[in-house]
Amino acid sequence: HSDAIFTDNYSRFRKQMAVKKYLNSVLT
């Protein structure tokens, strides 16, 4: 169970980082 929670949080974190990177590339 803890692995599933960790993976879920990790994928969500990765998505947030990808979105930030995308926004940065669009805004600059």
Swiss-Prot record:
Domain of life: Eukaryota
Pfam families listed in its UniProt record: Hormone_2
Keywords: Amidation, Hormone, Secreted
Subcellular location(s) of the protein: Secreted
Sites bearing Threonine amide, chain numbering: 28
Cellular component, GO, one term: neuron projection
Primary localisation category: secreted
Example GO BP: mRNA stabilization
InterPro entries referenced in this protein's UniProt entry, alphabetically: Glucagon_GIP_secretin_VIP, VIP/GHRH-like
GO MF annotations, alphabetized: neuropeptide hormone activity; peptide hormone receptor binding; type 1 vasoactive intestinal polypeptide receptor binding
Family: Belongs to the glucagon family.
The name this protein goes by in its record: Vasoactive intestinal peptide
Organism annotation: Amia calva
Gene field: vip
